[in-house]
Amino acid sequence: MTENYKIIGNFIKDMSSETPDTPTYIFVRDKISKYKLNIDINSKAVKNGIIEVNTILRFSDQPEILKKAHFEITYTSIVKVDEKVSDKKEMEKIILCDVPNKIYPDLERIFLNLLTDSGYPGIKFEKKIDFTELYKQRAN
């Protein structure tokens, strides 16, 4: 099947690593395996069939934990959608499934480097994110 979109660019819109102090760093270093990865995707039309797709990763502990670090990245993809795409469902699939599946390997590498460079080496996300499956679950 021919792709009905083209990613014309990607960039890091925002990136954050917050560890407030040394006691928190020591606490988090021992507990970071309990942190959860959350994903959010949003988009907005720019002009002439160009869409900005923001894929946001957040890696954090439960809200009730006081000593915690927070890691977040917003990775933006500039997407040119084929003018033949007019169906809302098809557009939704491009934004929520196709683009994230294509950019995720780079996004994960950048995010893991952020964690390593923030003093938390060796973190791996055991489960690979299947945006196709998430999209199907959302549709049901």
Swiss-Prot record:
Keywords: Chaperone, Cytoplasm, Protein transport, Translocation, Transport
Pfam families: SecB (PF02556)
Assembly and interaction partners: Homotetramer, a dimer of dimers. One homotetramer interacts with 1 SecA dimer.
Organism of origin: Pelagibacter ubique (strain HTCC1062)
GO annotation (BP), single: protein transport
Gene name for this UniProt entry: secB
Job description of the protein: One of the proteins required for the normal export of preproteins out of the cell cytoplasm. It is a molecular chaperone that binds to a subset of precursor proteins, maintaining them in a translocation-competent state. It also specifically binds to its receptor SecA.
Homology family: Belongs to the SecB family.
Single annotated GO MF: unfolded protein binding
Protein's cellular compartments: Cytoplasm
GO cellular component, one term: cytoplasm
Matching InterPro entries: SecB, SecB-like_sf
Record's protein name: Putative protein-export protein SecB
